[in-house]
Design a protein with these regions (language model features):
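Conserved alpha/beta enzyme-core scaffold
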Residues: 1-231
């Protein structure tokens, strides 16, 4: 089945206000840049975005925060985005903060059809407030629910028209598991190749998980925090 779509704008034509979107990426690495830009252009609002972090003020999810298109963020680290901090402090943005390992497992569980699981991480802290706790073998555990989305936006290095994807190094991050945990998965790739060009043993996301794929453009290597030393 040919899953190619001509552009990011065409790929999100069914995205509606109030949707929950899983967005791959770690820092500024492996984020679906073209899809985020398309959402900004389309103006879709009241979104719940599930992503490791919220980008920076002028890039990534930060572009959607500027337009007040995001209602709620489910994240692990948001310290690089000043606007994010301001919106949360003013009560204009809901935040569900997760330990990073718990965040990853919640998405994996959602993709595996597991509704909830117990973890010791976060017990006795603010992330456990309002959640069921239980003791197992003398240890206290917190109940966490699996995460699923209406959409998942993933960014891959290479892909083919059937939706098979290969990620590159750190850019893999949360993308593969997010591709399993949404009703509709859109992949943007740096290079769209012909069938047979991808080594099956190196495919990270099988095409069965992907609904639409397109070749992105204008990718820019961003550095989130530059550290230099005088020698």
């Amino acid at each position: 089945m040919d899953k190619r779509i001509p552009s990011a704008d065409a790929a999100i034509r069914n995205l509606r206000d109030g949707a929950t979107i899983l967005m791959g990426g770690f820092g500024l690495c492996g984020i679906p840049e073209n899809l985020i830009a398309a959402v900004r252009r389309q103006g879709t609002k009241d979104l719940t975005v599930v992503s490791n972090n919220a980008g920076v003020d002028e890039f990534g999810i930060g572009l959607l925060l500027q337009q007040r298109q995001v209602k709620k963020m489910v994240s692990t680290y948001v310290g690089e985005n000043k606007l994010f901090e301001q919106l949360v402090a003013r009560g204009e943005l809901q935040l569900e903060l997760n330990p990073q390992g718990t965040f990853a497992e919640r998405i994996r569980a959602g993709g595996a059809g597991i509704p909830a699981f117990f973890t010791p991480t976060g017990y006795g802290t603010m992330v456990a407030e309002g959640k069921e706790t239980r003791e197992f073998d003398g240890w206290q555990y917190v109940l966490e629910r699996g995460i699923r989305g209406d959409f998942a936006f993933v960014k891959a290095w290479k892909g083919d028209r059937w939706g098979n994807l290969i990620y590159r190094k750190t850019a893999r991050n949360f993308n593969p598991m997010m591709a399993t945990a949404a009703d509709y998965v859109i992949a943007e790739v740096e290079e769209l190749v012909e069938l047979g060009e991808l080594d099956p043993d190196k495919v990270h996301t099988p095409g069965i998980y992907v609904n639409a794929i397109f070749q992105g453009q204008g990718y820019e290597k961003r550095i989130e925090r530059r550290t230099t030393a005088r020698i």
